[in-house]
Structures are given as structure tokens and as C-alpha cells.
Curated annotation (Swiss-Prot):
One Pfam family linked to the record: Myosin_N
Post-translational modification Phosphothreonine, affected residues: T64, T69, T419, T1242, T1256, T1287, T1468, T1502, T1518, T1731, T1737
Gene field: MYH2
Protein name, per record: Myosin-2
Role description: Myosins are actin-based motor molecules with ATPase activity essential for muscle contraction.
Comment field on protein domains: The rodlike tail sequence is highly repetitive, showing cycles of a 28-residue repeat pattern composed of 4 heptapeptides, characteristic for alpha-helical coiled coils.
Coiled-coil spans in chain: 844-1940
Keywords recorded for this protein, A-Z: Actin-binding, ATP-binding, Calmodulin-binding, Coiled coil, Cytoplasm, Methylation, Motor protein, Muscle protein, Myosin, Nucleotide-binding, Phosphoprotein, Thick filament
List of residues that carry Phosphoserine: 392, 625, 1093, 1097, 1163, 1238, 1244, 1262, 1289, 1293, 1304, 1307, 1475, 1496, 1515, 1543, 1555, 1575, 1601, 1715, 1727, 1740
Gene Ontology CC: A band; actomyosin contractile ring; cell-cell junction; cytoplasm; Golgi apparatus; myosin filament; myosin II complex
Amino acid sequence: MSSDQEMAIFGEAAPYLRKSEKERIEAQNRPFDAKTSVFVAEPKESFVKGTVQSREGGKVTVKTEAGATLTVKEDQVFPMNPPKYDKIEDMAMMTHLHEPAVLYNLKERYAAWMIYTYSGLFCVTVNPYKWLPVYNPEVVTAYRGKKRQEAPPHIFSISDNAYQFMLTDRENQSILITGESGAGKTVNTKRVIQYFATIAVTGEKKKEEATSGKMQGTLEDQIISANPLLEAFGNAKTVRNDNSSRFGKFIRIHFGTTGKLASADIETYLLEKSRVTFQLKAERSYHIFYQITSNKKPELIEMLLITTNPYDYPFVSQGEISVASIDDQEELIATDSAIDILGFTNEEKVSIYKLTGAVMHYGNLKFKQKQREEQAEPDGTEVADKAAYLQSLNSADLLKALCYPRVKVGNEFVTKGQTVEQVTNAVGALAKAVYEKMFLWMVTRINQQLDTKQPRQYFIGVLDIAGFEIFDFNSLEQLCINFTNEKLQQFFNHHMFVLEQEEYKKEGIEWTFIDFGMDLAACIELIEKPMGIFSILEEECMFPKATDTSFKNKLYEQHLGKSANFQKPKVVKGKAEAHFSLIHYAGVVDYNITGWLDKNKDPLNETVVGLYQKSSMKTLAYLFSGAQTAEAEASGGAKKGGKKKGSSFQTVSALFRENLNKLMTNLRSTHPHFVRCIIPNETKTPGAMEHELVLHQLRCNGVLEGIRICRKGFPSRILYADFKQRYKVLNASAIPEGQFIDSKKASEKLLASIDIDHTQYKFGHTKVFFKAGLLGLLEEMRDDKLAQLITRTQARCRGFLARVEYQKMVERRESIFCIQYNIRAFMNVKHWPWMKLFFKIKPLLKSAETEKEMATMKEEFQKTKDELAKSEAKRKELEEKMVTLLKEKNDLQLQVQAEAEGLADAEERCDQLIKTKIQLEAKIKEVTERAEDEEEINAELTAKKRKLEDECSELKKDIDDLELTLAKVEKEKHATENKVKNLTEEMAGLDETIAKLTKEKKALQEAHQQTLDDLQAEEDKVNTLTKAKIKLEQQVDDLEGSLEQEKKLRMDLERAKRKLEGDLKLAQESIMDIENEKQQLDEKLKKKEFEMSNLQSKIEDEQALGIQLQKKIKELQARIEELEEEIEAERASRAKAEKQRSDLSRELEEISERLEEAGGATSAQIEMNKKREAEFQKMRRDLEEATLQHEATAATLRKKHADSVAELGEQIDNLQRVKQKLEKEKSEMKMEIDDLASNVETVSKAKGNLEKMCRTLEDQVSELKSKEEEQQRLINDLTTQRGRLQTESGEFSRQLDEKEALVSQLSRGKLAFTQQIEELKRQLEEEIKAKNALAHALQSSRHDCDLLREQYEEEQESKAELQRALSKANSEVAQWRTKYETDAIQRTEELEEAKKKLAQRLQAAEEHVEAVNAKCASLEKTKQRLQNEVEDLMLDVERTNAACAALDKKQRNFDKILAEWKQKYEETHAELEASQKEARSLGTELFKMKNAYEESLDQLETLKRENKNLQQEISDLTEQIAEGGKRIHELEKIKKQVEQEKSEIQAALEEAEASLEHEEGKILRIQLELNQVKSEIDRKIAEKDEEIDQLKRNHIRVVESMQTMLDAEIRSRNDAIRLKKKMEGDLNEMEIQLNHANRMAAEALRNYRNTQGILKDTQIHLDDALRGQEDLKEQLAMVERRANLLQAEIEELRATLEQTERSRKIAEQELLDASERVQLLHTQNTSLINTKKKLETDISQIQGEMEDIIQEARNAEEKAKKAITDAAMMAEELKKEQDTSAHLERMKKNMEQTVKDLQHRLDEAEQLALKGGKKQIQKLEARVRELEGEVESEQKRNAEAVKGLRKHERRVKELTYQTEEDRKNILRLQDLVDKLQAKVKSYKRQAEEAEEQSNTNLSKFRKLQHELEEAEERADIAESQVNKLRVKSREVHTKVISEE
């Protein structure tokens, strides 16, 4: 913690960044109790501060700071941190890490305007809603170069740390700024950019570019100017924020080797397009629209043809149009100048404004509906003319494209009519698309401008993205944002604990790694995995008929119940509808999927897009140049056949995922820093903080998640020296004094000696680490120890003070000795004559009076003794009474407990009875269900019986139909024979025409062979007819089997009947048992009532006892008061005696004076005086002893009195508690009595219900009996039917025998006819198949021709492709190797020990280089082998030209080539794996290789890559060389040589690449055919890629673990110079290899040209073959048409017959189903109506009960009011009594004053009495006695008044207690009323639901009726069609016969 002097460099910002020293000291010295100071959960404030009052039974009573007392559970109380942690800068350092501690720390810092706070790795910033001087230039300079712990929390500190890490660690950095809208993300992003622009300036001045004529700024200016431009087009006013960024951005600022700015680029995410066309009332659209209309630049208004009123444009005026905090005119100037600074041309600038104006005009486009049509037409063309002019389009074409877009249907384009709604939606979509594409184009243009082409080394990325969003209505945008945050949180969790683990590693702590990134894996996989939400959404977007419901159903099928993070949302009234819920790390979010498919597809009017592409405005045409329309695809399909089909259709979610993956890969390659922005309140009030809002954001931002992760490890850590200093107090003896001991050892000894959990801490190298909470425990122990030490010091202080007091006492003793000495001196003097005279005369005076006074004092003393004895006796009596009362109380408690146990037993019995009742009801239900099942079985039997009868009738019909079909078949046979003859003649003619072409002849011969096969198939069909006969026989057997089943069913029914009878008996027995139990219950109830009455009487007795006890207590209190009065009187008498003693002493003094005046006296008088003096002294001593005894007795009395009062008070309290308990028990007993009464009622009701049930059961039994009788009758009918069926079956069997005889006669003929029929059918089908096959063959031959045209090219290029694949694989190997090697360089700390073996490793490296060269040579050999194979393939192509029949053979060769390619790929993959293994094994050795050697290896491997990134990689290598700085100055010469060589290699490579590109253009056409084959290969490659990715991840982990080895590498760089010469030699070898590769490329070009010539020749041959095929196809088409005509007629007739038969059966089935459903619905409806009636009766009963309760409540309220009035009356009386007591008090004071006056007079009188005589004294004494009597009487009256006052106060207390009890009763009744009202509401709701259900059932019933009617109509129609078809078939049959 820095001092105030160190904070002075921050200037006026210092108090806003850190507490002053004074505040810190005050905070540490503030009193604090760790055990009682807590945070407590509170519903309004979320958490409040408080102190623990008590803890009991898992509940804690806490008193809050506001004074309220809360009783909560233990888990709702959180311990408070010690004061030294107040306003702590890093919240992770707190001893108690929990939500309230974090919240209050932020709140207290925010109250002090310290808006930045660390939380572990996070920097949390709270929006201050006002300007603070914390961003001044002096603050920037103050933070420059400071470590995080050296300066207070700030965004500049985060930025500077990132900058310093980048320079020192040579690693890319990123700053992730997240938070809700309005939290200050954009402001903090600006500050970060401002900081980097200030500290890393390049020093260049502004330039004027002569070429463009526009002013351009420096790179710093451009980076800063990018912000206003992006804000103008991407920011808008929202409810929370006036300047809210409606897009996310990732700004990369690139730096050079020296840390200066090199370049920058921006990536944007999730622009809110919908804001272009729609805004909420309190919001507005993007700022640019209002800047343009602000009229700051009138030329813009004229150019864009707009007005200055935004309300003229609906797209931008749906919400607000102005913002108080934004000046649109000034902002327009800033935007315009930003466009100029960023280097946009004048044309681009104009096009930006024009497109923005066109979007505004689009909102004014109006369309109307044509009369009598749904077609839309434009309503005026003025607006369209303006919009088209601004976009350089034809307005007529634009309107036509909007109203009549061209749509592709099949291979043709059709103009489609659009409705008004469709057109308006299309216009909105176009406006959004234009604006979005323009925004993205602007970002790319800014990136181009910011790319200065300067050498750049590393970058710092600033991510400004929306935080987690949980709204009432969450759509696709929220899912994307939340998914992004989920990924970022996973990234943070992983990164945070990686750093924690590194800290543990550094400190040498044993720790098993926990990857908290996996905590969120379930949710992330649910969203992005192959069958996750996004993939299902994209899949649904591919289907044309997909809807939101189908998407929802798919989600539910795939994830509901399978994934824990996917849930069905709860329906909440008043909230927006939700379709599914996801459990994110920040909470559960309900998503609404409405419109997701449209949002994801983002459809545009393709016709308008085509217009945009043809626009003369270059910018607009460029914006839509990438869009692939259907027309463009149709026109360019032949040219661009190689393009992927799905490239034009990329969904929003896929694009988002692609961008997100890019972002995550960028972030993973950086060292991240996290900033979380927080909104303190919704009202934008500075300094105010809403607890719930902030907590919600902390959860969403992952701050609390970070704390959770922190708590898993060791969040608290202290340096050993600090720990020793602070906690040495706990056990000072553990650390030996007088000798030096290391702080670590001291800490270890200290912790070992303390009684704590030793697993909760770990010892590091420099610090001791603690688990969360342990440090707080140590703090408590320290506080306790300090308390003990303080008490010891206090004891010592007290001892010292006591010694001082003792010293004083000694001094007093010495002074007493001095006094004694003086007395002794007096004793010596007393023998003087004068003194003797004095002693003699003094006792004579007033001796009589003193004797009397002594006598009176003795009497009073005796009286006090007697009274004391009496009071002690009374006290004993009271104590005995107390003992008896306690015994009685205990007896009463035991009785109450016994009664409570009895009640509990009664309740248990009641519960058992209720359970038995429920069981019986369940049994009754089972019985009824069985009965219903039996009825269903009956119904099924009857249905089966009907079905059997129907099947019998159908069998008869089938036999008749078979006979008819036999006759038809014979007729059809003759007709088909004639047709066959005609066909054979036609075939002969065709054979003559196709005689020239041998191939077609063979095909026709094959067709002839197929017809023969068809004839064979016809014979097979005849066999099937015989099988059909067998099937019929089987059906008869089945019928017999079904009859047997009927018998079995009947047996089952009989068994079920017996079961039912048994169940009935059981039910009757159970009813009897229920009645018995009911009687027992009645008896028990009577017993209970008797017990209750006994209890009532006992309670009344107890109440009477209580009253008596209260009376006794009151009497005792009165007695106590009397004793107090007596004590007071005693005190008064004592005061009197003391007064008299003082008077006597005064008189003695006067007498002595008189004696001295009088002179001498007689010796007798002196002796008398001596005697009297002795007596007087004796009396004085007695008096003093008496007074001492009196005081002692008074003190003991007071003590006893106080004790007895306290005991009596406790007894009174106990008795009051007992009374309250008894009253409560009484009320509970009353309630229990009521409950028992209600139970009795319920039992009686249950009894009634059971009786009803019995009756219903009896009715059911009777019904069952009747049903059983009916079933018996049915069984009898079935037996008769069975007999009839048996006879019929006998007849059928006889008929079958006859028919079989006929069939046996006709079977041969039938078989022959059926064979012929089937042959003809087969012939027709085969002719159709042949036609189709020929058509397909034609198409395939055409396709094959196309294939053959390009086959030679394909064969030629396959070689090149394989070669490229090999080179690619080699380059991948090289890439991996370079990656691993370059990464491995950065982690070489672990290899310090292996320095000595450097020479050996260098030799191994050389061997490795030789091995690589050998591999290159082997690859060249494979390349040659491939060339040879290509030549072979060319020979194969020549052979394929000989004949088309060899195509199959060629395909097999191609497959072989593919297999070889695969094998080669596997070989290359195996080589890759081997190289990876080698890389892993040699990795440890390669770490010590020098920079120059690595650069040369990089050169070697980059040469092999043959890609366009060679320039970039070489520049990277040169930059890596430059990293060495001054040390590696000598290597610059080598760098120049490498650059020269690089330029030569580059030139050679560019030539090779140009030739390769030329070849690739031709290969694209061949790739179309190869795609099918490649897809399989790609899949395997993808699998291998996944394996490689896995290997990547593993290696990345290895690389990360090697990061710590960098320091050793820096030390070893000096040795690199020695290897320089060797590397130069390697470079020369690489040049040779490059030349060799160039020669190979030249040879490949020559081969390619040769193959082109061969391909041209083959093309000519293919054209000739195609012409011949086309002639054949035309001839085939003629034959097919004739065959089709004949086949169509036959097929139509058959199809219609079958269809009608099927429809008839379906209709009959539907009829049966519908009737059954109708019956079911009817029964359901009746049952629902009954339940509704029951519910209505229950509701009426409850309403009556509720009215009674309300009446009772009103009565109670009236009673309460009366009690309150009584209390008021009593209060008034009390006031009166108080007034009277005050008056008496005043009187008392007056009397006391008079007494004092009288006393004064008495003194005067005594003085006079000495002179005047005894009579006057006696009179005055009498007067004094009278006055004393009056005073005593007045005192008694006063005491009585006080007693009365106390009585009234007690009465008032009783009344207040009674009022409180009444109030509680009222509240109880109110609760009861509320509960009953809730019950009523629930019953009403049930009734409503029942009504709804009945209504739905009615609607279902009506619907089914309607369906039934429709089914009947359909059946009628089907029957009529069947009849018509039968008539038609007969007519056809007659025609055929007539033709024959």
C-alpha cells in the first residue's frame, strides 16, 4: 500500500483511486467483533449488516444496523471481514469470500468514488454516471511502467500491464471488456485505445495525400478516429444508455519490435440489424440518421433528397429522435472528419451517405392491394424514384422486382405475385441488409487503411462485447450473446486456474489440476455439438416446410430429458411465452423461438439483389457481389461448376459460429486480461447502488464464478515475514527468542503448534497459502489471544493501583498514630486542676436527659431486633411457599406433557384411520376398474364375434370374386395375345431399323431375354394363386381356432365372474370392518371428549391456582413495600439519634465553656463529673456499637430484600410464562377440540360416503349380476352360433370339396391363363422399365460423354493433384515441425542441466537435417513414380476411346488409382506421425539450438510450403532475429544475405505459382465429377484432422508447459554466432533443392500441355458417339409411347378397384372407432359434470364457513377496539393518579421544609431552654412530636398513593398484554380467512378447469360426430364409385367379348 506522498503523482485523481493513510489507520483501529459482526440475507436489500444476538436450533437472531431484528437460518448469515479489509483493492484477498462481502466492498468503494476494483484476475468497474478526473494525462504518465500491485486499480493499469507483458514475454495480449448495456464498456475501450495511442506513438506527423486530395492523419489519429465513425453507424440510444454499442468489436492494435504502434484492425460481431427498421418508444435508431437530419450540412439534405424532420421517415422515428446528452450537429462534423482521416475516397464517402439516405426512403415505400386480388402494387412512385436514384437503379425495375420477384421452379424462372405484407417485409429485409453490408464494408475499409504495411511483431486485442443477457423475452440474439459469454467464461475459468496452478508450481505446492473450463462444457456442447441447438436450427432452415413448432419438437426429441442443461420452461402468468430453458453459468434463461428460422435464413428478394449487383454505384454493386442469386447460378452454372453448392446459403448462426471460433482461437493465442463493467442503478443516479441489480451482474459477469473457483484453491496467501509478525501472538513460545530463525521455519513451527485443521494450508517457497475461511479463523484466535493479554495487563494495572491504595492506608495509619500520640499527651494534661474541674462539672449537666435518651434507644434497639426476627420468619415462610409452588408448577408441567402425548396419540390414531380410509377407497376404485375391464372384455368379445361373421361373409365374396376373375382372366388373355402379336411385329420393325447399331441390337436382345424371364415370373404368379387357395384353407382353420379361443374366453369370463364375486365379498367384509372401525372411532371420540372436559376442568383449576398465586405475589409485594417503609422509618430514627448525639456533644462543649467561665468547683462535683464522663463514654461506645450493628442488619436486610425481590420477580416472570403457556395450550387444546370435532364431522361424512359407496357397490353388484346374466345369454347365443357355424363349416367343407374338384379341373387352365396374364403384365412392366432404363442410359451416356470429354484431363491432372496433396502433406509436416520447434524455443528453462551436451545435440540435429533431405529425395522418387503412373493412366484413356463397353474397366482402374492415392495419403500420414514423434523426441534437444539455426530451418520448411505466405514468414523470422537487440548486432549481415536469397526464391516461387494457378483453373471443371469420390476421402481426412487437432491440443499443452524455459534460451543466445557459418551452408543446399523443385514444375507443365492435345482428340470421338446415341433414343421413345398407352388402361382399372375396396374398409373401421370414441367422450363428459356439481357444493359450504369466520374476525376486531378504549381509559386514570402523586410529592417537600424550619426553631428553643427552663422545652418537644406524627401520616398517605399508582400501572400492563393477545388472535383469524379464500379460489379454479375440460370434451365429441358423418359420406361415395367401376368393368368385358 503506497503512502500519501507516493500517491501525489496522480494529482487530483489520487482521492478517487486509493484511501488516504489516515482513513486506513482509522479503519484498522475501529472496534470489531468477528463472532457477532455479520451480513444477513434480507428480502428488500438482498444483504444488510448486523450483529448476532443469539443462536439456537439452527436459527440465528440478528439485529440489523437499522434496528430491526431478523431470525434466519444459519446459511443466510455470512461473517463480516475485519476492518482492515474495508474498501480493499483486490477482493480475492478477503478472508471471507462471499456475495455480500463483494457487494459491500464495491458499494463502499463506489460511495468513495473509487470505481475500479480488482477481483483476482478481474478488474471490476462501476459506472459513476458523472465525470471523474481519473483519465487526465498526468494519470496516464503515473501508470506508465507500474506493476499491478504498485498502483491502485485502474483501466490504465490493466492496459500498461498488457503492454509490458507483450514487450517482456513477447506474447500477444488481449483485454476482454464485458458488461450490460450502459455499464461503460465503450468508454473503457476508448480509454484503452487512448492509453496505447499516448504511450506507443510512432512520432509521425499528419500528412496530406496529393493523390486523393483528402487529409489523412497519423496512425494514432486514425485509430482514435475509427471510434466516432463506428459509433455513428453502430451506436444508438437505448433505455439504459444514450450511446449504446449495438455490436461487439475486437480491436487489434499491432506493435513493432520496439513497442511502437505499427498498425491496427477491427473485427465486429452481431450488429443489431433490426434497429434499422424498428425501435422501442424510449429508444432510437443509429446516430447517423439523426446526424444527417440535424441540418449541420445542408448539402447532404439536398444530395439525399430528404427533409430535416426525422418524423417524415417511419424507419427512424418509431421511438425518440433526440438525446439530451448528444449534440447531433457536432457529432456529424466528427463523423465526417473521421471519414476523411480514415482515407475514404470522395466517391466512397458520397456512396455511404447515399445508401444511408436510401435506407431512410425505403421506410416511406407504400404498397396497396389490387382490387379483387391479393397482389400488391406500388402506391405512388415518388419515394421509389428517390431511393432508386440514390442507389443508381431504375425505379420501375426496383418496384417490379419488389412486387413481382422471379422465382426458380425446377429449371425455369417464374414471376411470383406478392401480398402487401410480403412486399413490406421484403423492403425491411433489404434495408437491413444494405445497412449491415455497408457497415461491414466500412470496417474492412478501415482495416485496410489502418494496415500500414510496417513490420509488426505482436498485438494487443481489445474485446468490447455485450455481457450475459437475461430478459423477459429472449430470442436468437440473446442465445448468441449468452453463448459467446459462456465460451468466454469457460476461457476465463481455464485461464484463471492455469495461472493459479503456475503460482502453486512456482511456490512448490502439491496440487492436482482442476480444469474449470469443463464446468461449462455441458451447456456449450448442448448449443454447438453436431445435434445441438444450432445444428438443429440450421437443419430446419434447409427444409422448405419447416416451422417454429417443428423446430421446437426436434429440440424436445433430441434434448428434453437427455440433457440436464435443457429444460421445459415453467409457465408464469404475465411473462412472455418461453419454449425452452437453458441452464447457463449465470442462471436459467427462457428462450422464445418465434421467428428463429426466418432470422437464421435472413432471406432477401433475389431479384432486387440482382439489380443491386448491376447498379452503376460501385459500392452497392461491391456490397452484393458475393451474393449468389438463383439466376446467376443458372447462367453461370456451366462456367463455375466447381463452386460449392452451399456457398450461397450460409445461415446467420453458422456465420456467427465461424466468427466466434475465430475470436476464440485469437484469444487462446493471447495472454488475456479481464475487465467487467457494472451498472450501479437503473436511474443513472451517481453514487446510488441497487443491491439486486449489482448481484445479478456479478453473477452474469462471472465475478462470483471467479470467486467460486478461487475458493477451490488457496485464495488467501501471506508472506512468511508478515505472517510471523502478525500471528506470533498466538503462540510466542513456539518461536525461540534470543536466536535467529528463518521466517518460513518460524511460520511452520507456529502453525504446527496451533490447534487448527492442518490440511487447510500449504507452505510455498515465499508464502504460506490458506484455504478460504482459515485466515478468518486465525484472525478470531488472534483477537481472543489479544483479549486474554489485555485482561492480564488490566489485572496488573489493578494490582498496581491496589498497592498504591495500600500505601495510602499505611500513611493513614501513621497519621492515626500521630493522633494517638496527641491523646496520650492529653492524658498527661488531664490531671491539671482546671481540667479536673472541667471533668467534674460536665457530666452533671443534662445527665437525666441522657439517661432517658439511653433508655429510649435501648427500647428502639429491642424493637428493631424483634422486627428483624419477624421479617426473617416471614422470609422463611415465603421460601417454603416458593418451594411448594415450584413443585406444583412441575406437577402441572408433567400433566401438560402427559396431555400433549395423549393428544399426539389421538392424532396418530386419526392419521391411521384416514390412511385406512384412503386404502379402502383405493380398493373400491380397483373393484370398479376391474368391473370396467370386464365390461371392455365383453365389448371386445362381441366386436370379435362381429368381425368373424364379417370375415365369413368376406370369404364367401372372395370365392365369388375369384370365379369372376377367372372368367375375366381368360378374356384378357385373348386380348393380350393379340397385343403381343402386334408388339412382336413392331419389335421386328424396330430390329430392322436398329440393325446398323450393334450395341442397340444387343440391348434389344437383352430386353427379349427379360420378356422371357417375365413369362417365367407369370408362371410363378400362378403358383401364388395356388398358395392363395391354401391360405383360404388356413383361414378356415383360423376360424376354428378363433372358436376355440371364444371358448377359452368364456372360461376366462367365468373365472373373472368368480373373482368379482370374491372381490364383492371382500368389499362387503371391508365395509363391515369400516363400520366397526367407525364405531370404535365414535367411542374413542367420546373418550377424547371426556378427556377434553377433564383437561378443561384441570385448566380452569390451574387458572384459579394461577390467580391465587398472583394474589399471593401481590400480597408479598405489598409486604415488601411495607418492609421498605419500615427500613426508611428506621433510617429516619437513626438520623434523629445522630442528630440528638450531635446536639448533646454541642451542649457538652457549651457546658465546658461555661465551666471554664464559672471557675473552680468542689471535689465531689469533680468525682461525679468523672463518673458521669465514664458512663457517658460507655454509652457513646454502646451507641456506636448499636449503630454499627444496626447498619449491618440494615445492609443484610437490604441485601435479603433485594434478593427476595429478584427471586419474586423471577417467580412472577416464570408464573407469567407458565400462564402464557397454559393459555397457549388452552388455545391449542381448543383448536385440537375443533380439529377433533371437524374430524368427527369428516368421519361422519366419510361414513355417509361409505354408505353411499356401499349402496353404489350394491347397485354395481346388481348391475354386474345382470351383466353376467347377459353374458351368460351371450355365451349361450355364441354356443348356438358356434353350432350353426359348425354346420355351415361342414357345408362349406362339402362345397369346398366340390369347388376343389372344379378347381382341380380349372386349375391347369387357370394356371396357364394366370401365367399368360402375369407374363403380359411382366412384359408391360419390363417394357416400361426398359423405356426408363433406356432413358436413364441416354442420360448416363450423355453424362458419360461429358465425363469422357474431361476424363483425359482428369487422368492427367490427377497426377498433379496427387503431387499437390503430397506437397501439401509435406508442408503440413513442415508447418507442424516449425510450429513445435518455434514454440519449443520459448520453453527451454528445464534444459539448463543439458548445456554440456550441446555438441552432441547439434550433431543429432545435423543428422536430422540429412534425414529430412533423404525424405525429400524419397518424395521426389514418389513424384517420379506418380509421373509414370500418370503416363500409364494416359494409355488407359487411349484404350477407353476404343470402345464404350470398356467404361466399367476404366472405372475399376480409377478405383485402383483412388486406392493407391489413399494408400499414399496413409503413407504420408504415417510419415507425418513419424515426423511428429521425431519432433517430440528431438524437441528437448532442439530447444538449445540457436536463433540463426532455427531461422534456417524455417527457411527450409517455408520453401516446401509453396504458398503465398512466404513473405510474411520470412519477415517474422527477420523480426525474431531483431528481437535479440544489441546482442545479436553481428547477425544483420546474415539477415541481408537471407533477404537477397528470399527475393530470388520468391521470384522463382511466383513463376511456379503462376503456372500452378493456370493449371488449377482447368482442374476446377474436372473436380465436379470428382466431388462424389472426394467426399468419402474428405470424411476420412476430417477424421484424421480431428486426430491431428487432438495431437495439436496435446502439443499445445506441452508447449505451454515449456514456457518457463525462455530465460535459459536468452542466456544461450550468445553461442548462436558460432553456428552462423554452418547455417549458411545449409541455406546453399536449400537453394539447390529449390532449383530442383523448379525443374520438376517445368516438367509438369510440359506433361500438362501434352495431355491437353490428347483430350482434344478424345473430345471429337465422344461427339460422334453422342450423335449416334441420340438417334437411338428417338427410336426407343416411339416404342415406349405405344407400350405406355396399353399399360396405362389396365393399371388404371386395377388401381381404381383396389383403391375403392381399401377406402370402403377404412371407412367401416373409422365408423367403428368414431362410435367407440363418442361413447367414451360421453361417459367422460357425464363424470366431469358430476365432479363439477360436487365441487360447486363444496365451494358453497366453504363460502358459508368463510362467512362465519369473517363474522368471528369482525367480533374479535370489535373486542379489540373495546380493549383499546379500556386501555385508553386506564391510561387517563393513570395520568390522573400520576398527577395526584406529583401533588403529594410537592406536599411532602413542603412538609419537609416546615420540618426543617421547626427543627431550626427547636435548636433555638434548646438554646433558650438552657437559659429559660424545662417547661418551655417540654412544650416544644410536644409540638415536635405532633409535627413528626403529621409527617409520618403524610408519608403513609404518600406510600399508599405510590401503591395505588403501581396497581394502576400493573393494570395498564395487563390490558396492553390482553390487547396484544387480541391482536394476535385477529391476525390468526385473518390468516385462516386468507387460507379459506385461497381454498375457495383453488376450488373455483378446479371448477373452471372441469368446465374447460367438459367443453373440450364436448368439442371433441362434436368433432368426432362430424368426422363420423364425413366417414359415412366417404363410405357412401366409395360404394358408389365401386358400383360405377363394376359397371365399367362389365362394359369393358362385354366390349372385349364383342371384339373377339
